[in-house]
């Protein structure tokens, strides 16, 4: 959704990020919502307990593994940001992924997923869910339109990312939603790289949205969290799964998440603007063989990004170095400001080597499908001054061709 586009309630995403989900009347007139650290909640009478047990007090709190007021507030905020009926936050993005998938699948079911998926997701599909006889089949982005003929009688879900980690391949959301509906399968997107500031997949017809809230939602690299957004009926199933496996979010982390969300719109825009400047600089650098960034006019997904990502290319830039691991090592070791670390979406610029991070342990075939090689480097661009980021990257690149 455009950053100034209004929600059904008439509020723009930047306003929802600040005020969404919050109760206007707080105890003692507090401007900031309190943090409810309590692990359990009492009842005034035995009759209240009985009514809660019978499901007659849906807004009551009982035990924080099931629900907590601080957690509920951030869930309402994220649901409104995505334009969904309901949301559930979890202890990590991986927990959100597992619960989103397991909530609808049973033994014998099949999940079709894009082969350009985050490494952790691939391992959940192939190493964890497979233990419950839930199988995964991987297809290319180009094959999504053929979902109705690709699916089997066992296919229950379709999972994909857009933009995809790490080289920013985009999926046409309208096409994917139509293909999933025609195939009669439930569609879930990992929209972590985009955030609802850039795109709202539910408005295109995608059934559910997952985010690693550790990233842009938190925005300060100081928490781990995940979230799933969709219809009330579906989210009830995901919430039930999360509470049963203990994947719910701690209220202290929920408070940090809510605080981070308040600056989401401005942080995402700043990151996108810096990313475009960095990507343009990298295209002119002789030590860079290729730049992957859909905000560049010569990128194959540029027009799609203009259409469905509010005209931005996102906050992640990937490159292929003119070289391999030895050149990558010299580059990483020469950086002075940019930090070598996994993750993304924080205020600081990070650089990672997918071969040894998000896609470690992948087979050569899997790496080719994901577009990852020994030359691939991913930048998660922060909100520092763009010239400082570029200067640091360029001085480090200048040393990749040097030998001792």
Positions of PLM-derived features:
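N-terminal glycine-rich, Lys/His-bearing helix-loop that initiates the first secondary-structure elements
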Residues: 1-58, 404
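PLP-dependent enzyme catalytic core of the Aspartate aminotransferase-like
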Residues: 2-3, 126-127, 135-137, 156, ...
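Conserved PLP-enzyme active-site core in the AAT-like
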Residues: 4-10, 17-23, 86-287, 292
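Glycine-rich beta-alpha junction loops
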Residues: 22, 37-44, 193-195, 215, ...
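Conserved N-terminal alpha-helix of the aminotransferase class I/II PLP-enzyme fold
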Residues: 40, 45-95, 120-127
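Short amphipathic alpha-helical segments
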Residues: 59, 85, 224, 253, ...
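Acidic-histidine catalytic/liganding microenvironments
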Residues: 81, 282-286, 335
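Conserved C-terminal alpha-helix-loop-beta "cap" of PLP-dependent enzymes
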Residues: 287-377, 381
